[in-house]
Amino acid sequence: MVSDNSGNLYIVAAPSGGGKTSLVKKLIEMVGEIEVSVSHTTRPMRPGEKEGVDYFFIDEEQFISMVNEGAFIEHAKVFNHWYGTSVAQINKRLQFGIDVVLDIDWQGAEQIRHAYPDAVSVFIIPPSLDALKERLMNRRQDKDNVISERMTKAQDELGHYPEFDYLIVNDDFEKAAMELQSIVIANRLRIEKQANKQAKLLSFLLSSQ
């Protein structure tokens, strides 16, 4: 259980190649007091990735063991690899008043919303399927058959957009980044958030009348 002054939880989801990871990294650079939750995964490390920064890379046996121990608030199998979000990682940050952003897929987002009803969810979509395919090809991480599989799955994933609170079209990266930042800032300024955070100031101002 988190306190009234706890941090906010944000979910950012998108089809593979939608740009959510780049947008989340930009958000962390632009906004203070917010951190990305590092997920556990059984997939191999990609070039440029770092252990404990991009993911915690573990084998399937370790992953299943953590599932059985209840270590994950959500977990899902995506493209034959497991991904999971640690309960402890989220709650520790929220309890210290730090905002947490989750870079996950729609399946994980669904599980997170059940556990954290106040979480703010954002779905990122590409300007077109052609643009999405081009991004997947430009990453040079997957073979043609894997890209085709990702494109087929993307069309199914896009159908889940109504389940989210906000929708951002990632056509212009800088514009999309500003829109994501605006969502975070606006949520921080909601009355129920500010009433707790600014309780002393409000009490002083009202008692001075």
Curated annotation (Swiss-Prot):
PANTHER family: GUANYLATE KINASE, GUANYLATE KINASE-RELATED. The gene is gmk. It is an enzyme of class 2 (transferase). GO terms for cellular component: cytosol. It is found in: Cytoplasm. One of its GO terms (molecular function) is guanylate kinase activity. Keywords: ATP-binding, Cytoplasm, Kinase, Nucleotide-binding, Transferase. Residues 7-185 form the Guanylate kinase-like domain. It holds the Pfam family Guanylate_kin. It comes from Legionella pneumophila (strain Lens). It catalyses: GMP + ATP = GDP + ADP. The lineage of its organism: Bacteria, Pseudomonadati, Pseudomonadota, Gammaproteobacteria, Legionellales. Its main location: cytoplasm. Its EC number is 2.7.4.8. ATP binds at residues 14-21. This is Guanylate kinase.
